[in-house]
Design a protein with these regions (language model features):
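An N-terminal structural lobe/cap that precedes and organizes the functional/catalytic core
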Residues: 2-112
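RAMP-family (Cas7-like) RNA-binding scaffold and associated basic/acidic loop-rich RNA-contact surfaces
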Residues: 4, 11, 93-287
Length: 287
């Protein structure tokens, strides 16, 4: 697809009629320029999502910079901003929490499971449990063969995917595969290191510090909480005092994608980064 390609309604209708997909591949680079670090999202234990991909017949070490789920959420929030700014019109369902000023509402563009989320399941519409309401029934009765109800009330669920796993039938609820998938991958990724240190201007060390009965601290042994062997002690470092020598953040055990002793949380440098987005047209045709 050339960089000057403009997707019009006529082109989209023609593509949906017979093509397999609309694909976007966009080269990206770090804000600091080539060679500067980027910091992927961390997962259990502080590891990044490392994987090996086949590129031009070669194994290439890659790292996930933004997942399919995360990209979908970003797209949904962009739609929500445009909707609230009046730049587009779109059906939107919201669960409102008037008594909680810091929350106010959660919409189908924000809830993790979209219209199928437990937030809406456990809400009411005009005093009726949501799933027993006109809108709820239209959503529940939607199927791959007839998704008109879902299209009317929550069309974005047909684009970003939905699984009605929170209803009365649990995991047997209707599934709609996502039609739009996007992710950002870093190719030729090399792990960096994360360092930490602290110089205590007070120079606190080798001081007897005790824990008080209310879990505070004191230097008075007589006011300390008594243990089996006398006053219960603690260390200055436990109170965020004393020096922390320069250290590297390394894995203390083998993790899913990182071996013991390998760097954690240190960012990565890349040969290149790329956004790949695919709109499945067969997926749209099924609807």
């Amino acid at each position: 697809m050339s960089t000057d390609f403009i997707l019009t309604l006529d082109r989209l209708q023609a593509a949906v009629a017979g093509a397999a997909a609309i694909r976007l591949r966009q080269a990206l680079e770090p804000a600091g320029g080539p060679g500067s670090k980027v910091f992927p999202p961390t997962h259990e234990g502080g590891q990044y999502a490392w994987e090996t991909r086949r590129v031009d017949g070669q194994d290439v070490r890659c790292v996930l910079l933004d997942s399919v789920q995360s990209q979908a959420n970003r797209c949904e929030l962009a739609l929500l901003d445009a909707l609230r700014d009046g730049r587009l019109r779109l059906p939107l369902i919201e669960a409102r929490f008037a008594e909680f000023s810091d929350l106010r509402s959660v919409s189908t563009l924000e809830a993790p499971h979209r219209i199928a989320d437990a937030i809406f399941r456990d809400s009411t519409l005009d005093g009726v449990p949501f799933r027993d309401s006109v809108i709820g029934k239209a959503f529940i009765e939607s199927t791959i063969r007839d998704a008109n109800g879902l299209f009317r009330w929550c069309p974005t669920a047909l684009v970003f995917g939905m699984w009605d796993s929170t209803g009365s039938v649990g995991g047997l609820g209707t599934k709609f595969a996502r039609a739009l998938s996007a992710e950002i991958i870093g190719y030729g990724a090399q792990a960096g290191v994360h360092t930490s240190s602290r110089i205590d201007p007070l120079g606190i060390k080798n001081i007897e510090i005790y824990v008080t009965p209310d879990e505070d601290w004191t230097t008075d042994a007589g006011a300390a909480k008594q243990g089996k062997s006398g006053p219960e002690k603690t260390k200055p470092s436990a109170l965020n005092h004393s020096n922390i020598p320069p250290t590297l953040d390394l894995a203390e055990e083998n993790l899913a994608t990182v071996k013991k002793g390998e760097p954690l949380r240190g960012g990565v440098t890349l040969d290149r980064a790329e956004l790949c987005a695919v709109l499945s047209l067969p997926g749209l045709r099924k609807l």
